[in-house]
Amino acid sequence: VCTTTHIYPEKTMPCLVSPAQAEIAAALEKSPCICVGAWSENGKFGPPELPVGTLARLADYVIVEADGAKRLPLKAHAAHEPVIPPEANQTILVVGASGFGRPMCETVHRAPLAAQALGVPEDTVVTPALWARFLEHEHLHTRVLVNQADLPQGRELARRLAAGLCCPVCAAALQKEWIECLS
């Protein structure tokens, strides 16, 4: 696990700071999942010094967090986002089910961008169909994961979102380690 921006160091796995290839290989012998990066601002991890392509030769899978949403469940991306490594063969967009049924201005990071793209006011209530339309407009994903699907009606909201998308969609409750593929 690493980032192209900034993340808090993972507490559930070993974190290696500016590791050499040999250190990564040794860590992967002991643990199936590790976090690599370099210290950045505010105690966060920044991008690793080694290229993602090098990491991919060392690990079976490399998960790169490419963009944050300021702890909001939904996000509209600026033109320079997300920072996706050229080696990426999948982009999994994570959305939070808690963003549905509430005004865009309360649940979407960069709500003005989403409102403008959709031609709606920022206080428009976000529905799965509306958000599917927006995600298809952005077209920054190959798959979508709807987190927080354990909330009341969460699975149904995820199914409605999936109905409007042209890609595989999974519903999940990541903190409870539960996931269900919907399409």
Q: Positions of the model-derived regions?
A:
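Generic recognition of cysteine residues
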Residues: 2, 15, 33-35, 105, ...
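Conserved catalytic-core segment of NTP-binding enzymes
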Residues: 42-58, 67-168, 176-183
